[in-house]
Structure formats: C-alpha cells, structure tokens
C-alpha cells in the first residue's frame, strides 16, 4: 500500500466516523448495527446487566463442602468474608465441644478411679475373709483327723485321777445300794475299809466305774464281809 492509498483509506467522512463510533460503543446484534446509531447516549434505555452466577461447576472442583455450601447462597465477592466468619464460628464450636468432652472424660475417669478403689478394697476384704475361712477349715480338718485316728489319744494324768475319784464314789455307792436291795444290808454295815480298798483297786484296774468287773468285785467283797460277820 502506498502513502497515498493510506491517506485515502484513513480520510473518512463525518458520517463514516459516527458509524464507526457507534459500532465500537453499541453491542452488535447478529452482525448488524442498531437501528439508530446516532441516538444520544442519555436517550438510550439502560441495558440490564447479566446476572452473575454464584456457582459454577468448573469452579467448585477442589472446594471444601463448606465452601460449596457458601457459594450456593452467597455472592462470590462475599465468599471470602463468609468463609472467614463461618470458619471462626466452627472453630469456636469445636473448642467448646472439645472442652465439654474433656470435662466429661475427666468426670468419667474420676468415677472409674473411685470404683476401682472400692473394688480393690472389697477384694482385700474378701481375701481376708477367705483366709479366715481357710484357717478354720484347716483347723476343723486337723481335729477330725485327730479324732478319727486309729491310735488312742493319750489322756492327761490329772484328768484320769479326777475321773477315777469321781467314778469310784459313784460306783461304790451304786454297788452298795444294789446289794442293799437284794440282801437288805445298808451301805454303812457293808462299807468296811477292806471293801473300800478292794473297790479302789478294781476301779484302778478297769479305769472306769461302770464295768461288770467292778460291780462284781465290790459285791463279792460285801458278801465275804457279811459271811465273816455271821
């Protein structure tokens, strides 16, 4: 293109300039210029601004659930402020919940420690009672073994003497009373020293006063004493 042709290309008429300005300022409609491009700006009707979409599927990728929820109801320009406010609220709720859970766990731990101490004390008492019962059972078993032993249990000498003295008195009076009923002899008449000595020897030999040998020896001695007196 030569210089002359360039000057001729940019040498525009006034009508051409208006048409060009109108094309630059007015949106095109199917490739056509508006009906009245020379209309004044103040006479033109205000055009509605396109509504801003608050949620775009391509922008929601990689967002958290809270961010997606906020984008659903809040304008995109206010999302950052909303996220900050909601984040602070959630942090406060989380701290309050954590403090409540900590207090609850401490209370439960205290109750468990008290229950454990009570259980330990109860176990100690049960162990003490069990030891006492075991000792009693061992003592009873030892006594049963001693009483059922095939070997006779030795007697205390003092107990033997006391039993013999008591047995002799009872046996001697019983023998004399029996003989008195048969022969009509009183204990005073038949109770000489010789008869008493013989009864003592018989009691010492038999070690108890209720044996047939004891009564027989006492009665025989009384008979002999009566014969001597006749």
From Swiss-Prot:
One of its GO terms (cellular component) is host cell cytoplasm. Keywords: Host cytoplasm, Phosphoprotein, Viral RNA replication. Its main location: host cell. Residues 40-61 have a biased composition (Basic and acidic residues). The keyword Phosphoprotein applies. InterPro entries: Rhabdo_M1. It is found in: Host cytoplasm. Phosphorylated. Residues 20-62 are annotated as: Disordered. Belongs to the novirhabdovirus protein P family. Essential component of the RNA polymerase transcription and replication complex. Binds the viral ribonucleocapsid and positions the L polymerase on the template. This is Phosphoprotein. The gene is P.
């Amino acid at each position: 293109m030569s210089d002359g042709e360039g000057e001729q290309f940019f040498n525009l008429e006034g009508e051409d300039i208006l048409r060009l300005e109108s094309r630059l300022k007015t949106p095109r409609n199917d490739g056509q210029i508006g009906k009245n491009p020379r209309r004044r700006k103040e006479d033109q009707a205000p055009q509605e601004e396109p509504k801003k979409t608050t949620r775009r599927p391509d922008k929601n990728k990689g967002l958290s659930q809270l961010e997606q929820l906020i984008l659903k109801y809040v304008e995109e320009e206010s999302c950052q402020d909303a996220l900050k406010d909601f984040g602070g609220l959630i942090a406060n709720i989380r701290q309050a919940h954590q403090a409540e859970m900590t207090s609850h766990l401490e209370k439960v731990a205290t109750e468990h420690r008290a229950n454990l101490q009570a259980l330990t004390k109860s176990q100690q008492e049960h162990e003490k009672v069990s030891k006492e019962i075991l000792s009693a059972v061992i003592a009873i078993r030892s006594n049963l073994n001693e009483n059922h032993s095939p070997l006779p249990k030795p007697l205390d000498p003092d107990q033997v003497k006391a039993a013999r003295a008591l047995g002799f008195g009872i046996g001697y009076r019983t023998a004399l009373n029996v003989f008195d009923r048969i022969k009509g002899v009183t204990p005073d008449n038949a109770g000489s020293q010789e008869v008493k000595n013989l009864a003592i020897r018989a009691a010492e030999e038999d070690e108890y006063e209720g044996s047939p040998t004891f009564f027989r020896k006492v009665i025989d001695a009384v008979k002999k004493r009566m014969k001597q007196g006749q």
